[in-house]
């Protein structure tokens, strides 16, 4: 594809999509909020440590590829939003699946259904499979089905926004992190708490800006 993403660009794009779909009231995202989202320990594979300089560079790359833009909301803090849905004509179910693949790498049908639930509910595995088929049968495919490895019961699916998947090498890379497992109840609670903390931080920052503006009237 013409818009090949590197690892940091993929993480930033995935986070922008995720926050738009899970916490739209705090979207678009500031650079600080986006860095926090990129470095979450839940809903991420692998876990990454990206400072704001790295995130800003990834945003520059996405803006050059016309996949992200500076939001024109008139606020004092610059905020960013993604353009993937508009650029590729993706519907919410497709966007949710692509987002999970960007954030966690190759996954099975069952894993995708469970993990995408927070963004878009799927009634059954057939619904997820239908979305994956649409993404694979596009003029320029966005998803591919990986060969099933020995010892695995199910095949996994991977996004192609980072270029062609080198099958065995890709599988080995993710196997090094350990096999994918379904999120436990504890993982779900941690994910929700982290999202609430991020949202509260954004709200505090907004209140501080209001206070600063108010003080400025008397200076």
From Swiss-Prot:
Family: Belongs to the UPF0502 family.
Cited Pfam families: DUF480
Name of the protein in its database record: UPF0502 protein Ppro_2903
Superkingdom as given in the UniProt entry: Bacteria
InterPro entries referenced in this protein's UniProt entry, alphabetically: DUF480 (IPR007432), WH-like_DNA-bd_sf (IPR036388), WH_DNA-bd_sf (IPR036390)
Disulfide linkage: none
Organism of this sequence: Pelobacter propionicus (strain DSM 2379 / NBRC 103807 / OttBd1)
